[in-house]
Amino acid sequence: MKLWKRAAVVLKDGPSLIAADDILTAAVVKATSHDELSIDTESAQFIYRHVLSSPSSLKPLVSLISSRVKRTRSWAVALKGLMLMHGFFLCKSTVAESIGRLPFDLSSFGEGNSRIMSKSGGFNLFVRAYFAFLDRRSILFHDGNRHRYNEESSVLIRLVIIRKMQIIVDSLIRIKPIGENMMIPVINEAMENVVSEIMEIYGWICRRIAEVLPNVHSKIGKTEADLALKIVAKSMKQGGELKKYFEFCKDLGVSNAQEIPNFVRIPEADVIHLDELVRTAMESSEESAERTEIAEEEEEEEEEIETKLSDLITLDHNEEAPASPPRVVVVDIPDLISF
């Protein structure tokens, strides 16, 4: 059966290899082959070394990968294409930040026959989950959001960036193989990429939370305090989810998940402190709104009195003078305009 599959791979990838007009194009075809049983690591490493030494080659490489992924119905080609793109970030190529939104859409890959019980249904779901993560990650890093995180950034900007990174972690832990038929080397290597990414991003989040919390004090606004509290609550929940995810990966035999990290827990005292800040900010906001409402009511009363006073002291020049001298009416103006 394996021999038949390998023969099919040769038939599918052969024409593309023959048509390849340079060694780099051939490397992309090999790294994204139809082979569901193995992955050509050497070709992928060759591509990464080339990009690191010649950053300008990334754009044509992305076009090659995109062209191959767009027209395939093979989960193996699609997944390997995603892994190859992900590798540009993992190998610390700064030029990878120029990619932005992925130039292909795999959000509905294989949806026509993606039932869980079907032969390739689990693989198609895996591809869609991997794409959702990588597309979101590529967009976030393209915007340079993480790199705007510095001491000069406002507390709100830093909190927003941390929250976006937490969303990236959420998309990572949704990447899971379903079914025993998915326990193969290609999936295992993809999971190693996922675990590596989680370790880097979640570690970054924990360090940044520790940095920004001391800057969350009573003088900041309700928006900042409320967002900080949500981030801390999410971090505590995410720590538990990641522990379960790593246990899952360990059972799968993912090599870099054999030791479950001691995920940082936010001290309960910090959570209580943030909660108090949010409550105080809310009460202050309510008091401010009440004072504003009272001031507006007083202003309306002043306008009404001024209108009445104006009516009292306005002379009607069109009125004819009476025959006899009018009775003198004394208007105590100071009393009318005193408040």
UniProtKB/Swiss-Prot annotation:
Chief location of this protein within or outside the cell: membrane
GO molecular function: 1-phosphatidylinositol binding; clathrin binding
The organism's place on the tree of life at top rank: Eukaryota
GO cellular component: clathrin-coated pit; clathrin-coated vesicle; Golgi apparatus
Acidic residues biased stretches: 295-305
CDD domains per record: ANTH_N_AP180_plant (cd16987)
Domain annotation ENTH: ranges: 16-148
PROSITE patterns noted in UniProt: ENTH
Places the protein is found: Membrane, Clathrin-coated pit; Golgi apparatus; Cytoplasmic vesicle, Clathrin-coated vesicle
Region ranges (Disordered): 283-307
SUPFAM superfamilies noted in UniProt: ENTH/VHS domain (SSF48464), GAT-like domain (SSF89009)
One GO BP: clathrin coat assembly
The keyword Membrane belongs to this UniProt entry's keyword annotation: yes
Matches recorded under InterPro entries: ANTH_dom, ANTH_dom_sf, ANTH_N_plant, AP180-like, ENTH, ENTH_VHS
Keywords, comma-separated and alphabetical: Coated pit, Cytoplasmic vesicle, Endocytosis, Golgi apparatus, Membrane
Alphabetical list of PANTHER family matching this protein: CLATHRIN ASSEMBLY PROTEIN, ENTH DOMAIN-CONTAINING PROTEIN
Protein name: Putative clathrin assembly protein At1g14686
